[in-house]
């Protein structure tokens, strides 16, 4: 007698490797909004998102390409850029009335000191409330770009000063 197929076809986004539904379910049922951090080959993208039945809603967003407006001259995909993008997102979220969120790194590997955690550190230092463990955050030297300036002084010798000036410009937006 026929019983049908003995296999199960996974959801399309799971088959494509784009969504971890187990992790998404845990994040969606939380009462706080999510701070979503995604890295591309050229940029870091941070968003504050809430889940609704019609679809997720983005309340605040920041892209590392916007750092040029604040005087940042370094790469838009490194650890200092992630730190500054997280800080920019937090400043915008605080101005919009958001006070906290839960970190959502998607399918990115949770390696201590990774760029997604640099964005978290920037948001926390700007005054945004996100639960986290201090051990996963990158060192201050990495967020300021001192490791890049040490490695390539001819190209990025002034990066720590540039990051500090950009932090001042971003925090000036809060006032």
From Swiss-Prot:
Example GO molecular function: 5S rRNA binding
GO terms for biological process, alphabetical: ribosomal large subunit assembly; translation
Keywords per UniProt: Ribonucleoprotein, Ribosomal protein, RNA-binding, rRNA-binding
UniProt keyword RNA-binding present: yes
Signal sequence bounds: none
Pfam families (UniProt xref): Ribosomal_L5e
InterPro entries: Rbsml_uL18_euk
Keyword ATP-binding: no
SUPFAM superfamilies according to UniProt: Translational machinery components
GO cellular component: cytosolic large ribosomal subunit
Subunit and interaction comment: Part of the 50S ribosomal subunit. Contacts the 5S and 23S rRNAs.
HAMAP family in UniProt: Ribosomal_uL18_A
Protein name, as recorded: Large ribosomal subunit protein uL18
Gene: rpl18
């Amino acid at each position: 007698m026929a019983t049908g197929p003995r296999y199960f076809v996974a959801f399309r986004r799971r088959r494509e490797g784009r969504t971890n539904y187990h992790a998404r379910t845990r994040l969606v049922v939380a009462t706080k909004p999510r701070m979503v951090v995604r890295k591309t080959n050229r940029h870091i993208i941070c968003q504050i998102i809430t889940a609704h039945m019609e679809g997720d809603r983005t309340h605040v967003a920041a892209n590392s390409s916007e750092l040029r407006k604040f005087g940042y001259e370094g790469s838009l995909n490194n650890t200092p850029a992630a730190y500054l993008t997280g800080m920019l997102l937090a400043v915008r979220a605080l101005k919009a009335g958001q006070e906290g969120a839960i970190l959502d790194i998607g399918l990115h590997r949770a390696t201590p000191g990774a760029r997604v955690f640099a964005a978290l550190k920037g948001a926390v230092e700007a005054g945004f409330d996100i639960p986290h463990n201090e051990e996963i955050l990158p060192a201050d030297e990495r967020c300021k770009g001192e490791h890049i300036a040490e490695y390539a002084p001819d190209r990025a010798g002034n990066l720590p000063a540039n990051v500090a000036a950009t932090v001042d410009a971003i925090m000036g937006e809060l006032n």
